[in-house]
């Protein structure tokens, strides 16, 4: 089991997370998810995925992220579109970060995609990627994108000297997204319940605020 191994596999494909790596189409047991509000990362776009082992569930925490079982994987791919003005832009996959729940705790690593976007290779020491894209205003942008090393990955996720996930809190997931397998939108917590990942979703009054939504109140 690549997730529970003491070492990180050299190639991302060894985890078997994706049926179609280029299109970022996951396998049946890996589900996409989104966060209501997320960290800014040099204008990159992100795709997030979750794997929870069969017959295991995440436990609700009111003031923290879900408590995920051993063998859980949180997967996040960073990319730029070639041209944000296009109806169907071509994604330029940069890296995929994995956060794995092992017996020794959460472990983080980054994988950098090859030129053909067929697979991604483990980069313990990180890497700098020179890349460019065209934004929605038609401006060409370039950046020296920095892939973090393993220590930097763990520093960002450290709390009380323990590595933990940051984003998947109930209030940050409490909104609808489109699911291609059921061909409709559904609240993410409800979908997780239907997939057997959590017990019946606890009704929460608050949803995290989307910082990009200019209609929200400042109060």
Where in the sequence are the language-model features?
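N-terminal pre-domain segments of enzymes
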Residues: 1-51
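Short alpha-helix capping/helix-loop boundary micro-motifs
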Residues: 58-63
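Short, well-ordered loop/turn sites that connect or cap secondary structure elements
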Residues: 68-71
